[in-house]
Amino acid sequence: MATKTSNLGHLLLSLFILLLFILSQVGVAQAKRLQQRNKLRLDCVPLPPPPPPLRGIVKPPIASFHSASPKDKGP
């Protein structure tokens, strides 16, 4: 009798593990399919044009240092 119970326990445990494995594989397949669907959906939507440049922003001047060479001194 103990052997039958042990075999039944192993059978139920094996079936439970098999069920978990199948459910995990189904979940992985659904995730891949959803990811591909989202990727295709994003490929079909055109990107909006970039915003126009702001004209109110003044660019800082580029620093120019005077040369110390003799030809720039003048008369």
From Swiss-Prot:
Keyword Transmembrane recorded: no
Disulfide cross-links: none
Residues of the signal peptide: 1-31
GO biological process: defense response; defense response to bacterium; response to herbivore; response to insect; response to salicylic acid; response to wounding
Motif (SxS motif essential for MIK2 binding): 67-69
Organs and tissues of expression: Mostly expressed in leaves and seedlings shoots, and, to a lower extent, in roots, stems, siliques, seeds and flowers.
Keywords carried by this UniProt record: Apoplast, Cell membrane, Cleavage on pair of basic residues, Membrane, Secreted, Signal
GO CC, one annotated term: apoplast
Keyword field contains Secreted: yes
Subcellular localization(s) per the UniProt record: Cell membrane; Secreted, Extracellular space, Apoplast
GO molecular function, one term: LRR domain binding
Outcome of gene disruption: Increased growth and fresh weight.
Conditions for induction: Accumulates upon infection by generalist herbivores such as Spodoptera littoralis. Induced by wounding. Triggered by salicylic acid (SA).
Location of region: Disordered: 51-75
Motif (SCOOP motif): 61-75
Family: Belongs to the serine rich endogenous peptide (SCOOP) phytocytokine family.
Function (record text): Brassicaceae-specific phytocytokine (plant endogenous peptide released into the apoplast) perceived by MIK2 in a BAK1/SERK3 and SERK4 coreceptors-dependent manner, that modulates various physiological and antimicrobial processes including growth prevention and reactive oxygen species (ROS) response regulation. Inhibits root growth. Prevents general growth and development. Exhibits antibacterial effects against Pseudomonas syringae pv. tomato DC3000, Ralstonia solanacearum, Bacillus subtilis and Agrobacterium tumefaciens, thus being an antimicrobial peptide (AMP).
Subunit structure as annotated in this protein's UniProt entry: Interacts with MIK2 (via extracellular leucine-rich repeat domain); this interaction triggers the formation of complex between MIK2 and the BAK1/SERK3 and SERK4 coreceptors, and subsequent BAK1 activation by phosphorylation.
Protein's name according to its UniProt entry: Serine rich endogenous peptide 4
Species of origin: Arabidopsis thaliana (Mouse-ear cress)
Phylogenetic placement of the source organism: Eukaryota, Viridiplantae, Streptophyta, Embryophyta, Tracheophyta
Gene: PROSCOOP4
